[in-house]
């Protein structure tokens, strides 16, 4: 019997003396009773309000009996695909099946279906025809209205219509789920619960729907992508809990999907209360024989300090899910949780993270947001920081200092990600200094994403000059501290707006940096982001202007290969990309070249027999070491590899790439293999 955990079987329910639960929570993730998991927060919150909850984690979707473990619940079913969209969880951007599921015991893949929320909803409806079904979690939240689905390459209907569910609780859900539970407990029919903020419902007519904005009809959007772009941007402009309007999406047969305004953000006291619930902070013991749940490793000794993000990245869905208004826990709440870590025998003295979507956002962007909401017509940081932005790290710094003082804590890391433009906007460098001194272990990961300003513009990221300022300041601070620490940039290929020209520019940047990433993130069109809308429609929904979109798999492979141009396996792709970009000047023996030209078969045979045309002044294949013109009969025969600016221009503190064999190795002497520590290293 595990009284510490909520029941996961009829036996455990009966051991509690219950003959029925109020709600059955069906989850695509294994049961992990930790506040990093949405199912843990919602079920514990319901428990705190007096409701009896049973959990069915990862039911067998091929067997409808798998969701009858507790029988019919008194009030309803709650369904979530898990902490991730099930399709992102299952497939890479190239649509290849992933090998591991970190949210499943033993990391085993295949324990949940594709489109899990839809499958679970219909599975329940087969047996329980009239029992209320409420969808929640990120999959339902980001698919609550018509949305582009990358995996099927089509515009899909609201998840509410395909799942057999009655309501969607979108966003973080604490406020709406308690209101729904109390309404059902009071005897209201689920069809009459159409008024709760943070929910989406379906109706047959609009007689009881007031102050609503009518979106483009689904059937028309399927025929015209530009109509979808307009609808999406209207949705985007109504994600604020203070200014957001009620939205109505018409469907055929006089059916309407109604999105109520977002729920109001939690107060700090409410946030503290949520994270003070009696979590077991680990996975259910029944998973022990399978090796546990891998996802717990990184989050077990991490602290969630905030929610929301006003960064405004185009490829991120946080605006649709958590909103732009920052919600935080108090210092006292964070310290109290951290003091429990040393009591765990698995704790080694390291707090893995103190953050959230963005670690260094600890307050709303400006004073007006908690009263009037975030601006609908402009961003807080993009393209430049707003004049009303309050960039202040004092409170966050105070929290980190107190965490370092806790007995048994050796090191406090920050791994959520630092928003470097916000950091630079703070006139006080104290946090920056202490970040380098105490919270970085050799390398700091940051996300410039790209270096070409046209691509950064589409991404909603600051121009590259801002990142350059950050790198120089980071180096200066570490030098003053006597530390050798480096930056590891996260970079993205094939984002809308990235032509082959911009992709080559990114490769040149990495060449000057002397760094080749081990992994490359190709743009992934996930539901409900501005970038995904660009990918599907070919226009920027903010301006309705056309955007170049790299969609062809081969072109995407070339852009990805350019980031790892030193990898011999990528040679042909890089060569093809350089031809397309009209940059054959980057093929040769100069230190600025990305790859060397390949020898012709006749030249290889001569060298094999002891004759080297190059050693005798020949120019086999149009390559002359003296003239350094590898282009032969290319489009730019007169362009040589010697015509370059200072190779370290703009990167005086970074190590330039070595020259040679296409992998960055010297042709005259062996070079030390590049490692992650070469990033932003001084000469």
Model-found features: residue ranges?
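N-terminal pre-triad scaffold of radical SAM enzymes
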Residues: 26-29, 290-317, 342, 350
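Flexible glycine/acidic-rich beta-alpha junction loops that bind and position SAM and/or redox cofactors
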Residues: 85-94, 142-144, 174-179, 204-207, ...
């Amino acid at each position: 019997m595990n009284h510490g955990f909520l029941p996961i079987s009829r036996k455990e329910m009966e051991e509690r003396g219950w003959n029925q639960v109020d709600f059955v929570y069906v989850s695509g993730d294994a049961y992990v009773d930790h506040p990093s998991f949405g199912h843990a927060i919602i079920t514990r919150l319901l428990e705190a309000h007096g409701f009896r909850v049973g959990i069915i984690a990862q039911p067998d979707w091929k067997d409808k009996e798998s969701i009858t473990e507790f029988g019919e619940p008194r009030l309803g079913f709650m369904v979530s695909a898990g902490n991730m969209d099930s399709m992102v969880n299952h497939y890479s951007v190239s649509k290849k099946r992933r090998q591991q599921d970190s949210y499943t015991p033993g990391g085993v893949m295949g324990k949940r279906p594709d489109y899990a929320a839809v499958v679970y909803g219909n599975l329940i409806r087969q047996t329980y025809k009239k029992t209320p079904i409420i969808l929640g979690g990120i999959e339902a939240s980001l698919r609550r209205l018509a949305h582009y689905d990358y995996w099927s390459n089509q515009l899909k209907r609201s998840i509410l219509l395909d799942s057999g569910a009655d309501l969607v609780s979108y966003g973080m859900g604490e406020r709406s789920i308690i209101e729904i539970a109390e309404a059902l407990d009071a005897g209201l029919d689920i069809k009459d619960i159409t008024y709760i903020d943070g929910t989406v419902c379906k109706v047959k007519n609009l007689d009881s729907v007031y102050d609503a904005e009518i979106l483009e009809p689904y059937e028309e959007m399927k025929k015209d992508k530009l109509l979808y772009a307009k609808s999406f941007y209207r949705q985007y402009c109504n994600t604020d809990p203070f200014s957001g309007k009620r939205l109505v999406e018409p469907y055929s047969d006089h059916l309407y999907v109604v999105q109520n305004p977002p729920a109001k953000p939690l107060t700090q006291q409410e946030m503290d209360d949520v994270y003070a619930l009696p979590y077991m902070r680990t996975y259910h013991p029944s998973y022990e024989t399978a090796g546990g749940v891998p996802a717990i490793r990184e989050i077990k000794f991490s602290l969630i300090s905030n929610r929301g993000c006003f960064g405004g990245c185009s490829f991120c869905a946080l605006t649709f899910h958590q909103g732009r208004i920052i919600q935080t826990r108090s210092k006292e709440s964070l310290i109290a949780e951290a003091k429990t870590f040393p009591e765990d025998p698995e704790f080694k003295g390291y707090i893995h993270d103190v953050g959230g979507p963005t670690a260094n956002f600890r307050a709303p962007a400006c004073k007006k947001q908690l009263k009037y909401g975030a601006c609908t017509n402009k961003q807080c940081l993009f393209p430049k920081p707003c004049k009303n932005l309050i960039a202040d790290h004092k409170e966050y710094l105070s929290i980190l200092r107190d965490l370092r003082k806790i007995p048994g804590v050796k090191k406090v890391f920050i791994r959520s990600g630092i928003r470097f433009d916000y950091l630079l906007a703070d006139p006080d460098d104290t946090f920056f200094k202490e970040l380098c001194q105490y919270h970085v272990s050799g390398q700091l990961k940051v996300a410039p994403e790209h270096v070409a300003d046209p691509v950064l513009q589409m991404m909603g990221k600051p121009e590259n000059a801002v990142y350059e300022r950050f790198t120089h300041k980071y180096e200066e601070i570490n030098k003053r501290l006597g530390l050798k620490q480096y930056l590891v940039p996260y970079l993205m290929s094939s984002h809308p707006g990235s032509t082959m020209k911009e992709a080559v520019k990114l490769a040149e940047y990495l060449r000057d940096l002397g760094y080749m990433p081990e992994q490359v993130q190709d743009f992934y069109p996930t539901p409900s982001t501005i970038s995904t809308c660009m990918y599907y429609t070919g226009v920027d929904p903010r301006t309705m202007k056309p955007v170049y979109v790299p969609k062809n798999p081969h072109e995407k492979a070339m852009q990805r290969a350019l980031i790892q141009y030193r990898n011999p396996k990528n040679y042909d792709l890089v060569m093809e990309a350089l031809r397309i970009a009209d940059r054959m000047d980057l093929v040769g023996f100069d230190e600025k070249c990305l790859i060397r030209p390949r020898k012709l078969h006749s030249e290889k045979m001569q060298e094999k027999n002891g004759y080297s045309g190059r050693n005798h002044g020949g120019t086999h294949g149009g390559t002359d070491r003296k003239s350094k013109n590898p282009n032969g009969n290319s489009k730019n025969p007169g362009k040589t590899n010697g015509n370059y600016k200072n190779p370290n221009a703009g990167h005086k503190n970074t190590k330039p790439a070595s020259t040679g064999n296409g992998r960055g190795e010297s042709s005259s002497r062996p070079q030390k293999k590049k490692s992650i520590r070469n990033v932003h290293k001084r000469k």
